[in-house]
Amino acid sequence: PMEKVRRFLNNNIFIFSVRQGLLLTIPFLIMGSFSLVIMNFPVRIWQDYLASGAGSLLDMFLMGIYQATFGSLGFIFALMISYAYGEEQTVYDNTPVFFPAVSLCSFIAFCYPSGGLSIWGPEWSFTAICITLVSCWLLTMIYRWVAGHQRLYTMGVAYNFNASMQSLVPAVVTVAVCGVSGLILYLLFEDANIMNFGSYLFLQLFEHLGNGLPSILLYILISHVLWFFGIHGTNTLEAVSRRL
């Protein structure tokens, strides 16, 4: 049984893409971790220096590094996971770069009713991963359908032009489907927070359990399950940890 589970985890393109994509995020996580450690180093003299006029520029620089890494986890996850998916899939072998581009556009279109830069933050990372996988799968399916009906090769033009023309319909349909899906959710629930369904569902779950020991144990369990699948569980459940 364990061998079957291991084989399934290794052969499933979604799990493989998440695992490989999150491995690619390690340099950014390390940068964000170091900047956070340096900013909060528990030495009074150092903290006084950062708060002074001379150290304010350094503090601003470290905060910029933190915001560009941990503060942009949703963006980094979507970019890296879709890149790993594009490299692994075998349906479209021309230009895998369309997968990251379409995934990012799909995520923005889905979350548009919420607006703002907060959609790239850690609280949206689970939602970003889900939308990335759905958009990559949808893009692959449309690529397969288009390839079965028509192959576009224009003689005498650049290779990237042909790749762009082949990706036109799949990209437009994928982004449109994600955008319409997000708009429907917004209209049904009349709440922009539903766009971040990852944090929304987790918050609804923990809201009924309160702030006692069961909530803490469940938080630890879900966090480790997410880590098992390669998802940064602590950042995904950041909205929950603020409530506990």
Where are these regions (language model features)?
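Acidic/histidine-rich, metal-coordinating catalytic segments
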Residues: 40
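Membrane-interface interhelical connector segments
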Residues: 43-55, 238-244
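Signature of multi-pass transmembrane helix bundles
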Residues: 1-29, 35-37, 53-54, 58-228
